[in-house]
Amino acid sequence: MIVLRFLSLLLISLLCVSVVQADLYKKIDQQGRVFFTDKPEGRGYKLIMRTPKKGTVAYRQFEQNRRKLTPLIRQQAKKHKVDSALVMAVIHAESAYDQRAISRAGAVGLMQLMPKTAERFGVTNRNNPAQNISGGTRYLRHLLELFKFDIRLTLAAYNAGESAVAKYGNKIPPYPETQTYVKRVVKHYQYYLSDNKSL
């Protein structure tokens, strides 16, 4: 949706198991390009987000929120015909299941809805978990249909916008943040599928 949006979240993604667990590093090169990675190579990278480890207070809060919200996520996913594992993966990356998450760009809630997106999909209160998940899931369904159920393009559009994906010929835009976002959410998606947490 908005470049660098996820950096404003206190808890962001990569919280569950080793397959998706990593710290986040940032680098700005001489041309001003921004790069994100969980495996820094070479100089210039700075640690900007450390992943809470199992057993920590942050991890326990994450798990508590996830368990509490899972029935609601399943309900909305079924209603709008979207894989619940995909919805969980997006929520994991967008807000780490923190319904109070707010970005510097103005995105709010579990699925980090911007005002126009919320209005477009009938959300009147972005802070309400049920409304936020409903609106975000409806948006995912719209994007899935728009991009012929290509998961990666759907995620790229969720992050950078539909027009950005269209601008680059229905390919993932060459934005470091968007490319990192897509890879991260796909990892979460694979985790939720394999771990059956979405069933």
Where are these regions (language model features)?
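Positively charged n-region of N-terminal signal peptides that target proteins for export
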Residues: 1-6
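Bacterial N-terminal signal peptides
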Residues: 7-17
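Sec/Tat signal peptide C-region and signal peptidase I cleavage site
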Residues: 18-22
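A short beta-strand micro-motif
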Residues: 25-29
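Catalytic glycan-binding domains that act on GlcNAc-containing polysaccharides
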Residues: 40-199
